[in-house]
Amino acid sequence: MFTMKKSLLLLFFLGTISMSLCEEKRDADEEETEGEAKMEDIKRAEAVPPGFTPFRKP
């Protein structure tokens, strides 16, 4: 029973470290591509005609 608890604790600890490293990498990637994403949003926004609201009920 003790070895099973020890193994589960080790897996939890390693999983937590792995998740934090993934978050750091994702945050760094988001900072890199922030400018590119804004340009994409601007390009997409131009395609919608003025006054168009897709969620308006008749």
UniProtKB/Swiss-Prot annotation:
Expressed by the skin glands. Residues 35-46 have a biased composition (Basic and acidic residues). It is found in: Secreted. GO terms for biological process: defense response; positive regulation of muscle contraction; vasodilation. InterPro entries: Frog_antimicrobial_propeptide (IPR004275). It comes from the Eukaryota. One of its GO terms (cellular component) is extracellular region. Belongs to the bradykinin family. This is Ranakinin-N. It comes from Hylarana nigrovittata (Black-striped frog). The lineage of its organism: Eukaryota, Metazoa, Chordata, Craniata, Vertebrata.
